[in-house]
Amino acid sequence: MQSLLLKIILVFICSCEVSQQFSHLAQAKETTRDVAFEANYDGSNQKYIELLPAGFDNKQRHDVLITLHGHGSDRWQFIKQPRGECVGARQVAARHKMILISPDYRAKTSWMGPAAEADLVQIIGALKTQYRVNKIILLGGSMGATGALTFTALHANLIDGVVALNGTADLVNYQNFRAAIAASFGGTPAEIPDEYKRRSAIYFPHKFTMPIACTTGAKDSVVPPQSVLKLLNQVRPFSKHVLSIHRPTGGHSTTSADTIQAIEFVLKGLQD
């Protein structure tokens, strides 16, 4: 009887050890959460994806990489898609043990209007409450790149570094996606000119005192590069760390290599 009891105890102990080992292995992997929250802006249900790095330890401080998707996409773009911009962002986040946050920000045609802006402010506040946040880098592609520049100009105190991949800095004169932008902003440029100017980074180069990296393509007809190239020249007196990756034969996309170079440049600049 005693022998049987001893065997049962040993089996229980072994099973607990195995369970703990599997638990440790699970924690060692990346963890993805689809997070829902009630927006302070209008009480609606909004979402973002949270990707915690392998071996995440909330006792340690972590940098945060916020990725803003392009027009017509949603919060899953930077988490799942094989585009160079998305792969590059995920690789850098994993390499540096960064918390990767990919918000809907009023998908699918956000353009960083008032609602999207308010959601992102709320998300950043929640992250700082939940985690030991070190630096926050805001990155976006296309519409998301435009949004990254807009948000940084509006809330420079919340962003430590910005990466814009094929975006525009001038929504006053940008001619594409007019209907979607008007819906996001609450009117056309003729109806609310001040709102378009307020959300155009080109008019606020002095706000960009943090490291900034932008990619552009000379043959990009979807989001022409001229306004971003102009912004970068205007930003140089205010920021010590400015990187322009301009591809003379490039279109409306950024390779994973260029994406990685841009993010790493900003991370290095933050170490100064």
Which sequence ranges carry the predicted segments?
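Mobile cap/lid helix-loop segments that gate and shape the active-site cleft of serine hydrolases
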Residues: Q77-G84, G167-F204, M210
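C-terminal catalytic histidine-bearing segment of alpha/beta-hydrolase fold enzymes
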Residues: M112, V222, Q226-D272
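A domain-start/cap signature at the N-terminus of enzymes
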Residues: C16-H62, A182-A183, E191-D194, V242, ...
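Alpha/beta-hydrolase active-site loop
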Residues: W111-Q130
